[in-house]
Regions:
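N-terminal glycine/serine-rich phosphate-binding loop of ATP-dependent small-molecule kinases
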Residues: 1-97, 124
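Glycine-rich phosphate-binding loop and adjoining helix at the ATP-binding site
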Residues: 57, 87-141
Length: 142
């Protein structure tokens, strides 16, 4: 009889983390494929979106090879990752630039512009001021 398990994949800043877990929370396997950060200028932080996909595939292959897949029934896959990172796509859904990460600080001037244009309204509506790590200032920068 096969064990029912779940796969969790977290595409994080430092790496793609993959976990296989049983219903009771027992961890069957885990693996991390490291990712690098591209720093072109002080305060900038980028990654190549294709590297996320390559690391995910490599990690899943590692996990499957470390298990005997016929002994497991994979019930679902959960995904998370790259909150507030921006990936601009062309008309063919291909990245036009590296992903600008959540911890990138290049959008200081764009944040000032948003604050000037919205005053306190943005913070009152969203509960957040415009911050360099958020997506809207990055879109203005592009």
């Amino acid at each position: 009889m096969s064990k029912e398990v779940f796969i969790g994949i977290d595409i994080g800043t430092s790496g793609v983390k993959i976990l296989v877990v049983e219903k009771n929370g027992n961890i069957i396997a885990n693996h991390t494929e490291p990712l690098g950060i591209i720093i072109k200028k002080p305060g900038w932080a980028e990654q190549k979106p294709d590297d996320w996909w390559k690391a995910t595939k490599k990690g899943l292959i590692f996990i499957v090879n470390s298990l005997k897949p016929k002994n497991y029934e994979f019930l679902s896959i959960g995904l998370s990752g790259q909150m507030h990172s921006l990936v601009g796509l062309n008309i063919k859904d291909k990245p036009v630039y590296n992903a600008i990460l959540w911890n990138d600080g290049r959008t200081h001037e764009e944040c000032k512009f948003i604050k000037e244009q919205t005053g306190s309204m943005l913070g009152e509506i969203t509960g957040n001021p415009p911050l360099e790590g958020f997506t809207a200032p990055k879109m203005l920068w592009l």
